[in-house]
Amino acid sequence: MTKNRWIAFRFDNQTRLQEATRSDEFIPDPSLDMEYQRTQVDFGKKGYDRGHLCASADRLYQQEANDQTFYYTNMSPQRNNFNTGVWLALEGQVQSWGRSCTASDTLYVVKGGTIDKEEQVKEYIGGDRSKPVPKYYYMALLFKKGDSFKAIAFWMEHTDNKPAKTIKLVDYALSIDELEEKTGIDFFPSLNDNLENALEATYSTKAWPGLE
């Protein structure tokens, strides 16, 4: 199957920096055989954008890291209105939170699209079922500030609807537990069980500046 399920990265005092420039050179990932990667042909067949999972603007601390965001292994097919609308808006908000990190802070980010359940696949590209298009996209966030933690998730349907003039990201928010139920993924398994259970069961939009 030539589809990435999810990616994970973090913002911290080092990776929050903005010292690189956007390369815009879409290239194959040299670490993976081409038979397991999408190409421009796959995206162009049905008019999909090459949607970044890890955004170019997520990795500006180093040029090599930014260049790697243009690997085809980081691309997911997205309708243009979605890619440049609600997805872009959420990317920008996450980057704002990530770049607020100081020396003792870390924002852990997981992003992905749904391909494992038939009812969560939008369609397939090509003549077989090896290239699914996600019907939903999501993000899971865990913020560590000193000894305190907070978590939140987002779930959005992948449509080609024209974005609203004012995008309310709060409308897409949910708890990590709710996202895990939808995706079947255990997002932050390294946390202490008691802490994980408490963090993932609920969320507060007021705890995330700019969300309300």
Question: What does each model-found stretch correspond to?
Answer:
Residues 32-212:
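Domain-level detector of nuclease and nuclease-like folds
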Residues 1-50:
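Short, His- and charge-rich active-site/binding loops that engage polyanionic ligands
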